[in-house]
Curated annotation (Swiss-Prot):
Designated name of the protein: Cyclic di-GMP-binding protein XC_3703
GO cellular component annotations of the record: cytosol
Consequences of knocking out this gene: The deletion mutant shows reduced virulence to plants and alteration in biofilm formation. Deletion of the gene also leads to alteration in levels of transcript of a number of genes associated with a large range of biological functions.
Residues annotated for 3',3'-c-di-GMP 2 binding in this entry: 133, 135-136, 161
Pfam families, per database record: DUF520
UniProt free text on domains: Consists of two domains (domain I and domain II) adopting the same topology, which is similar to that of the RNA-recognition motif (RRM). Domain I is composed of the first N-terminal beta-strand and residues 101 to the C-terminus, and domain II includes residues 11-100. Each domain contains a four-stranded antiparallel beta-sheet packed by two helices from one side.
Keywords: Nucleotide-binding, Virulence
């Protein structure tokens, strides 16, 4: 029986490259000259932004988004925390979401059932397995999921006949 997996993952190498490019851009920008501002990537899951003021942290957010888009990473996978300000400066944690959460997986399954396609969807941890009798049904399911607007980027993987 043909099947495929629906996943939501971020390429860690591309993420590292995007953060490095964002740091390089900080070094070359005129409005950040002589300023202690930087991006730090922790375990490929959290990006820490730090700068002397919260205004500069917001500018850094725009730089980070631009670099991620240039590297082909969907910014919907990012969850921006609150800007923490103290005497030493301002910081913001940006969490990189990996995998499909249970609640979102249920929404995906409901969307497939609502489309009345001849496919079955089952939740396997942080991914969703969709099976059907015909390849055309699976292609229709992919089209339905691509058309639907979810708050996370979806990739389709492991297509088997």
């Amino acid at each position: 029986m043909p099947s495929f997996d629906v996943i939501s993952e971020v390429d860690k190498h591309e993420l590292t490259n995007a953060v490095d490019q964002a740091n390089r851009e900080l070094d070359t920008r005129f409005d950040f000259k002589g300023v202690e501002a930087k991006f730090e990537l922790e375990d490929g899951k959290v990006i820490n932004q730090s700068a002397p003021s919260d205004f500069q942290v917001k500018q850094m957010t725009d730089i980070l988004r631009a670099r991620l888009l240039a590297r082909g990473i969907d910014v919907r996978c990012l969850e921006f925390g609150d800007v923490e300000t103290n005497l030493a400066g301002a910081r913001q944690k940006v969490t990189v979401k990996q995998g499909i959460e249970q609640k979102q997986a249920k929404q995906l399954v409901a969307k497939l059932k609502e489309a009345k396609l001849k496919v079955e969807a089952q939740i396997n941890g942080d991914k969703l397995r969709v099976t059907g009798k015909k390849r055309d049904d699976l292609q229709d399911a992919i089209a339905v999921l691509k058309k639907a607007d979810f708050e996370l980027p979806l990739q389709f993987d492991n297509f088997r006949d």
